[in-house]
Amino acid sequence: MGKAHATPQLLFGGTFNPVHNGHLVSAMAAREALGVDSVTLLPCYVPPHKTAPTIAAEHRLAMLQHVVQENNHLCIDTCELDAGESIFTVDTLAAKRELWGASASIIWLIGWDSLHNLSRWHRWQSLLTFANLAVVERPFAQSDDINSLPPAVRNWLQQHRVSAKQLTQQANGGVALLHTPRIELSSSDVRQRLGAQKSIQYMVPACVETYIRAHKLYTH
C-alpha cells in the first residue's frame, strides 16, 4: 500500500448499454463521497457473440459523449474500446498504474452486486495491487449485508477496508464502502421497455433518449 501524491483518479467501467440515470447517480454520489474532481467512464468492449442484446460500440460511446457534454464532472476513457477485444479489469488497472506511476491514487468504482461476485473476477485478489476499490453501497446498509458476502470476499474486505478519506490518500490497497443513494435500475430494464415500446422517461437522460429514438436502437 503506497501513499498517494497525485490527484485521485476515479474510474467507472461498464458496458453502458445504454447509460442510464442509475449509472450517473452512482458516479456523482461517489465523486462527492470521495471528494474528487471528476469521474472517468470506461466503456468496455462487448464481443459480437455476446448473447445479451447489444449495439455497436460507436452508439454506446456516442450516448456517453452526449452525457459528458452536459456534466463537467464526467469524462470518458476509450482505452478498452480502442483495444477491440475484451480486457480484464485487473489488466486495465495494471496499465493505468504503469501509465500514471506508483504514487497516483487510482480508485475503481463498483456496485454492491459486483462486490458480492468479486471472487468470480479474473485475478480478483490482485486488483488491489494496482488500485483501490470504492463500492457504491445502500445508504442504510447493515452489518448483515457484509455477513452475506461470500466468505473469501468478506475476509478480504475486512483485511483491506478503509474510510473514503483514507482511500484518496493512498495509491492502492484499500476498499471503501460508500454511503450513497441506490437506484434499482439496470440497462436491461431500459432495453426491455424500449423493446416493448414503453416509456423510458426519467430512466435515462433526455439526451440519451433522444439519441436512442433518433437511431431506433433497442427496438428488437
Swiss-Prot record:
One of its GO terms (biological process) is NAD biosynthetic process. The keyword ATP-binding applies. It is an enzyme of class 2 (transferase). InterPro entries: Cyt_trans-like (IPR004821), NadD/NMNAT (IPR005248), Rossmann-like_a/b/a_fold (IPR014729). It comes from the Bacteria. Pathway: Cofactor biosynthesis; NAD(+) biosynthesis; deamido-NAD(+) from nicotinate D-ribonucleotide: step 1/1. Keywords: ATP-binding, NAD, Nucleotide-binding, Nucleotidyltransferase, Pyridine nucleotide biosynthesis, Transferase. GO terms for molecular function: ATP binding; nicotinate-nucleotide adenylyltransferase activity. It catalyses: nicotinate beta-D-ribonucleotide + ATP + H(+) = deamido-NAD(+) + diphosphate. Its EC number is 2.7.7.18. The keyword Zinc does not apply. Catalyzes the reversible adenylation of nicotinate mononucleotide (NaMN) to nicotinic acid adenine dinucleotide (NaAD). Belongs to the NadD family. HAMAP family: NaMN_adenylyltr. This is Probable nicotinate-nucleotide adenylyltransferase. It comes from Saccharophagus degradans (strain 2-40 / ATCC 43961 / DSM 17024).
